[in-house]
């Protein structure tokens, strides 16, 4: 309906905005369906990983590349601080599932922390473990909601759209990789 509106086709800028709405809504619905399918597989034990050597930094960079232009169009700056790739050895994991985690967290940062108009991402090594940090500079998460944000279907007080299962799926994927998925309020504001 958006493109079929005769008023839009006369104005190229309005047409571009209409197409952007369609793309964003398609992406949102596709993500929601994928999350629901993954959640169903996790619940009945059909969720599996395709384990191989994975360059964690390259997977994060792919996710950043996927979202950078979308964020720019929404007025959100996405800063990336790469680690020293030579010092980050491959890990054993599922590259697609790890990229799914990064994309979901980046999307959440934009939805819930977008008011800060800035998101930063980094990868590095701490105490022998590879660590990926994604931070928004928005209002953060109310302290009373922090213990629940990774629970299935929990949406908190945020008005942002979503299924409420994305972070639960991310948490499960990271656990299946032997990792830890933490969410906290960042010093100086925002969440990471």
Walk through the language-model features, giving the residues of each.
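Conserved micro-motifs of the catalytic ATP-binding
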Residues: 44-49, 90-93
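Short alpha-helical segment of the dimerization/phosphotransfer core of two-component systems
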Residues: 24-29
